[in-house]
Amino acid sequence: MKNCKHTLLLITFLLLSFWNGNAQALATNPKNEFRAVWIATVVNIDWPKMSTDNVAKQKADYIEILETYKKLNYNAVIVQIRSVGDAFYPTELAPWSRFLTGKEGQAPKPYFDTLAWMIAETHARGFEFHAWMNPYRATMDYNTSLLSPQHDFFKHPDWMIKYGGKYYYNPALPEVQNHLTAIVEEVVEKYDIDAIHFDDYFYPYRIKGELFDDTASYKKYGNGLSIEDWRRSNVNNFVRCVSLSIKNIKPWVQFGISPFGVWRNKSVDPRGSETEAGQTNYDDLFADPLAWMENKWIDYLVPQLYWSMDHPKASYSKLLRWWSENSTNTAIYIGNGTYKINTDSDKRWNNPNEIPNQIDITRSYKNIQGNAFFSAKSFLNRNQNVTKLLTENQYKYAALPTVVPGSIKKMAIVPTANNILIDPIASRFNVTYPLYSKVRYVMVYGAKFNSKIDINDPSQIIDKIAFKDDNNTVEVVIPSYKLDKNTTCAITFIDFYGNESEATLVNFTL
């Protein structure tokens, strides 16, 4: 190995936006765009594949998901860590999930902190980790014999409401709201997550002929409101409390919610969308995403637009426009239903261009900054004709997630490359973690000549390397085959909010 310390030029400088005639290319392939996939654990939808799988297989399968989506140039995973009053991590507030260990309340054997391990593996591959929780759903059915004695169904039976084949936490009870908030607080305090994520399950979807019996709570706490407004106020209060708690503990941790795709139909509210949805957020789930945005309680919203582009009752294209026009104070990403590809009664989903077309039209709205896809197994060794289209077009290049809303700032620090070495196999150098800062990643960019370096061009992204808590130095290794076209590289820092520093140029000139 040859030490090139005296022949390599190292320059730290401000890289201005250098478009170089690539404006159209950068618009087509944005540098910052949220690209996420949901990893559902409930009833083993995505992972673990079976609750009886051994730990080694579970780890291998999780890594396979990460590696698959890294190759597809995704940058975030939304992992379900609480689905039915259970947990994928050690806690006194809920039992271990049976979907992880085969028996509720039983820890993994051999023991490991599943959540901590998942976060480390996720960050090591450059992904954000969004911890997905279902706050109100307590069980999947009425078979309570499967529950641990430590489940809230047994510890607090007065918190439960029986409805539609499941048990739910009563959203009206202050003690329930406090308990669920404490669960969120514990995860934020203990784990290096990037976000807390709730999905569309607030009050349950209506079932004809069934009553969600919160009558006693309404009589006690209704305070003169209609039952509909009272239910919405219960959800709003919970969302507000969770938001305040997260930001009080770690202000860089995001709070995101993925609601049902229709706020209200225009037929009942002139502000609503041109849809004929059988149920809506506002009227049936008693969830009001517009209020959450207006009050700045959430960092991002991911409306679930699980319909085809021209669905007659809920058109993806019409709903996309509606959410863009009604967004405020909040990042908006769109939830896409990849699970419907080649499996839905709507035959539009048989067209391999449906998802690519949805991404294209999403990018045409400046108020929308990316997409999330349900769910992970959709592109895991299946639907390869769709993934081929994505990797050749929409997701040809890597992208960074968007900056946490309201947290855009200029980073005062810049990275420094040390111990620069090159050999026929690779070029290497070290980057040290800066003192008194919150830096998560080192970004590496490459171009053939110094004048061509443009950190706004996603085609120049070579790597994204995570700092580990126990290691304040990372080694950057650039294989020689990448340097054939990228003889010069630039490095930047990414902080915990997603802000990027100015760049340091590393010129491999012999």
Sequence positions of predicted segments:
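Active-site-adjacent "subsite" loops/lids of carbohydrate-active enzymes
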Residues: 40-60, 131, 136-190, 283-287
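Catalytic domains of carbohydrate-active enzymes, especially glycoside hydrolases
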Residues: 60-86, 190-194
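Aromatic-lined carbohydrate-binding/catalytic grooves of carbohydrate-active enzymes
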Residues: 72-109
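Aromatic- and acidic-residue-enriched segments that line the glycan-binding/catalytic groove
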Residues: 87-102, 137-163, 200-222, 267-278
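Active-site neighborhood of glycoside hydrolase catalytic domains
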Residues: 175, 179-183, 189-198, 202-275, ...
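Substrate-binding cleft of secreted/luminal carbohydrate-active enzymes
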Residues: 286-312, 328-407
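Pro/Thr/Ser/Gly-rich low-complexity, intrinsically disordered linker/stalk tracts
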Residues: 395-437, 500-510
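Beta-strand-rich modules
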Residues: 479-500
